[in-house]
Amino acid sequence: MPLPRQVAEDVNDARQRAAKRTKIIDILRRCRPMEPWPGHRQSGQSIPQDDSGVKGIASRLILTLHTNQAPNRFASIPVLWGILSWMRPHSSRLYNKDLAPTNPEQRTWGTYNFAALWVSMAHCIPTYMLASGLIGAGMSWGQALGTILLGNTIVLVPILLNSHAGTKHGIPFPVFARAAYGTFGSNVPALMRALVACGWFGIQAWIGGQALHVFFRSVWPGWAAAIPGSFGGHTATEWISFLLFWGLNVIVIYRGMDLLRKVENWAAPFVLVMTALLVWWALDRANGLGPILAQKGKFGSWREFWPVFVPSLTAMIGFWATLSLNMPDFTRFGRSQREQAIGQIVALPTTMTVFATMGVIITSASAIIYGKAIWDPVELVGKFTEPVIVAISMFTVVVATLSVNIAANVVSPANDFANAFPRLITFSRGGLLTGFIGIALQPWKLLADPSGYIFDWLLGYSGGLGSIAGVLIADYWILRRSELVVEDLYREEGIYERWRWTGIAATLLGCSAAWIGLVVPLLRPLYDYAWFVGFAVSFSTYLIFSSPLSVKKPSTATIYHS
């Protein structure tokens, strides 16, 4: 009995598709198994085409199948990418699994996670001591807290602008920078930012080690003298505590981002509660807020206040200037733009200001209780006579410092090093390298001056990071209108140059303008405005050097899917 015409046509179509499948399988059997393209699960991306050799033949066959207008096409895009995953259309010099775009299963961070991230990062000893450095420079407590609030509100703008790329495209900061600096040129801003983060890692690790040392001393009174000898002005047990805390950081690094998210979820509220209890203790023991809240600033006029306010404000921006660049490292795990934006807007300025206020209150009370203002909370708690209180307080400091150190000072440089040397360095190895560099920078010397890290450390590097932020924002929002071809960010011969010299030149000009005041006394005011100067110069010069016509467009042969 003859088959109906439509059935016969369907059978014939099925036979043709089966023959095409056989050809593809034969080709794939001759291909060396390779890692899948990093964006194969991402929606809205295009299929890269490679016309060379076996890969090109297979790619063209698959594209032919996909564009077939028959009612029952060969397969969906995910199936096609399952086949293409044997071909590696990306470059091994630009890709490893830690740099790959996140897939939907990895996007688990919501509003609370981003808010908790900032709360936990803000609750650290350097934040606690920010107001002390500003008050020491002559500000009143109100002026100091106002400067902190304003600085964190300003830096929130570039943070949100750069965060957008992480959530939209699922890419980390080093890959995001490839659009503006080139696929290999992106190593320049990535390594600049990484070195700053390494310095911060060392600072936080030393503070955490000191807290751990006091904790051990509270539970074991003979701890300080348990091991004789000293080095560099510090006892052997201090060095052991430092290395133990450093090791805790390494453990979290090797456990990955999911462990970080879990730690942040409970560490953030725990730190808030413990700090509030410390405020209650201080007010109860001092019978009042103390002399610092009552004293006025040393500046009698705006003319006297301005020369201190400007570099102080710039330093406050510099405090989180590192995160203004690499927030895509975190927002790539976000479920939506709305959730990541709300979490950051709510948490950053308020938490920084509230925690700094707590530091002012506690320190003010210490002036009454102990006869002098003690700005270092580790030193303050070390004076307590109740071992239980000391142990709980130091445990809080250790948890807070560990949380902020991993989130703020390990994630980005680890990705940066992996971006520069993807064949050799994974995220875990990059984190370990960050730890070693942090030790080599000798953080115990950086912390020798209690206010030096504000006017030397923060102010100094802010000019360089502001210059990078200017280029990234100009490229992503003005030239490219937030559109990126993600797969080409992982290819050497894609639409993005290997070295985009306009981005590098604009960054160097921004750095030069921001730092020239260090060598030319007449131009010292430029250094006081370092972040603003670096950002403005790099932003404007990048747009002058570039034009919309210089931005390569995706190939018309590219296929987009939903």
Residue ranges and their predicted role:
Residues 190, 217-254, 269-278, 312-327, ...:
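Transmembrane alpha-helical segments of multi-pass small-molecule transport proteins
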Residues 192, 203, 209, 240-284, ...:
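Membrane-interface loop-to-helix entry segments
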Residues 124-126, 150-158, 192-204, 268-284, ...:
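Selective recognition of specific alpha-helical transmembrane segments in multi-pass small-molecule
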Residues 109-128, 241-248, 279-286, 297-362, ...:
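Hydrophobic, membrane-embedded alpha-helices of multi-pass small-molecule transporters
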Residues 91-181, 185-188, 322-349, 364-373:
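Transmembrane helix-boundary motif of multi-pass solute transporters/channels
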Residues 58-61, 65-68, 72-141, 156, ...:
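Membrane-interface "cap" regions at the ends of multi-pass membrane proteins
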Residues 205, 209-218, 270-297, 319, ...:
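Hydrophobic alpha-helical segments and their helix-loop junctions in multi-pass secondary transporters
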Residues 101, 428-430, 468-541, 548, ...:
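C-terminal membrane-solvent junction of multi-pass transporters and transport-like membrane proteins
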